[in-house]
A protein has these predicted regions:
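Subset-of-secretome marker
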Residues: 29-272
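C-terminal motif of bacterial Sec signal peptides marking the signal peptidase cleavage site
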Residues: 24-27
């Protein structure tokens, strides 16, 4: 016959075992509500990439290294419509806008000098003491309209000061198109960011801006964070070359506005 003392000891042992089991399960982390955490790491990355592409909009902000160049992004991508924001490559700032197939770029003085040196007449005066006009931004972002100016028609007329108050239009048939358009395509941009990531391992969970995510770790401090609740969105990437990319504002309304026609210079005319 069991004594009351024996029953108490057994009950305490069972309670301790139960508490230990709960602690172990908590340490393993939950699989989340969207099931992505149960997949292989390769499948998780592919699912997150598809989620970025499927989103009606996404704001990508941060920096990384690509082809030896330091790239800083602040872009809002809109599904099937285009993108708006800024790209800085090795201290050269470019304001980028794509509406449908048409890409418009506006840069700082260094950017225009490089364009003029390649295609135009670099003898023209450069602006002094004036801030670089700001290209169109997504709604809710600061932006200033440039002073209207007729677009130049021949390379000899193209000067830094003339170009800096205009937008360069780059069409799908122009040689430079893919370079800029790839930055506004969600799948191409994510693949560029993820380039060189290599193999990844599951490395626990982390809360990213209030959303529970699974952490995938790789070489050179690479980290990929994917939401395990709700949509399996890509939330943050620490690429192997250094830097951090944040994926924000999924499915938030974004308005894209084309620049005034009078303020557009066709890059094809400069290259003639």
């Amino acid at each position: 016959m069991r004594t009351s003392r024996g029953i108490a000891v057994r009950a305490n042992a069972l309670a301790l075992a139960a508490a230990t089991a709960v602690a172990v399960l908590a340490g393993c982390g939950s699989t989340g509500k969207n099931g992505v955490a149960t997949k292989s790491t390769g499948a998780i990355v592919a699912t997150a990439e598809d989620a970025v592409v499927a989103a009606s909009s996404v704001h990508i902000q941060g920096q990384f290294t690509s082809g030896g160049e330091h790239v800083v992004l602040d872009l809002r991508l809109v599904k099937d419509k285009g993108a708006s924001g800024t790209v800085t490559i090795d201290d050269e700032v470019i304001e980028l806008l794509r509406i449908g197939p048409d890409v418009y770029v506006k840069g700082d003085e260094q950017f225009y000098r490089s364009v003029v040196a390649r295609f135009g007449d670099a003898t023209g005066p450069s602006p002094s003491g004036s801030a670089t006009p700001t290209a169109p931004h997504a709604s809710g972002s600061p932006g200033a309209s440039a002073t209207p100016k007729s677009s130049a028609s021949t390379p000899g007329d193209i000067t830094v000061s003339a170009m800096q108050v205009n937008y360069l239009h780059i069409g799908p048939t122009d040689a430079q198109y893919q370079t800029f358009a790839s930055l506004t395509d969600p799948r191409q941009l994510v693949q560029q960011i993820m380039q060189g990531v290599g193999s990844l391992d599951k490395d626990g969970q982390k809360d990213i801006r209030g959303t529970k995510s699974i952490v995938l770790s790789g070489k050179k401090d690479t980290r990929v964070y994917v939401a395990i609740d709700g949509s399996p969105w890509l939330l943050r990437v620490l690429p192997p070359g250094g830097g951090t990319l944040e994926f924000l504002d999924y499915d938030k309304p974004v308005t894209l506005n084309p620049p005034p026609a009078a303020q557009v210079v066709d890059i094809a005319k400069i290259m003639k």
